Structures are given as structure tokens and as C-alpha cells.
From Swiss-Prot:
SMART domains: Haemolytic (SM01234). Keywords: Cell inner membrane, Cell membrane, Membrane. The lineage of its organism: Bacteria, Pseudomonadati, Bacteroidota, Cytophagia, Cytophagales. It is a peripheral membrane protein. The keyword Cell membrane applies. This is Putative membrane protein insertion efficiency factor. InterPro entries: Membr_insert_effic_factor_YidD.
Amino acid sequence: MNKKEFFTGAVKQVFIIPVKIYQYSISPLLPGACRYTPTCSEYCVQAIEKYGPLKGIWLGTKRICSCNPWGGSGYDPVP
């Protein structure tokens, strides 16, 4: 692993860790309300892993904004 790969992986983890904290500490206390599969938080993690922090957060934000009664639902994987 070279320095660039290490740095990229570390930056991704900086953005993934807060989502994982949410998934394991806050999400279990709330009723299941996500209309999509995978859940919006898991979608965000997958998007960050696949595209990096900037595009991953953008895709995750768009997904969270569409997760409402007037938005979509069902299976929606990271593009």
C-alpha cells in the first residue's frame, strides 16, 4: 500500500465512522422508517467506499432527501 492509498483510505474512514456510530448507537433506538434497500445510512457508507468522500456524501445526501413519503422506495443500489 502506497502513501496515496493509505491517505485515501484514512479520509474515507473519517467520513464512514460517524455513519457507523449512528448505525450502532442511534438507529436501533428509532423505528425502522427507511423506504429503501439498502438503508440510507448503508447506502452512504457504500457510496463513500466506492466514490470517495465528496461524491459519496453528495450521493448519500441526495438519497436521504428522497427518503420521504413522496419520494421513491424499494431496491436502490449505489450506481
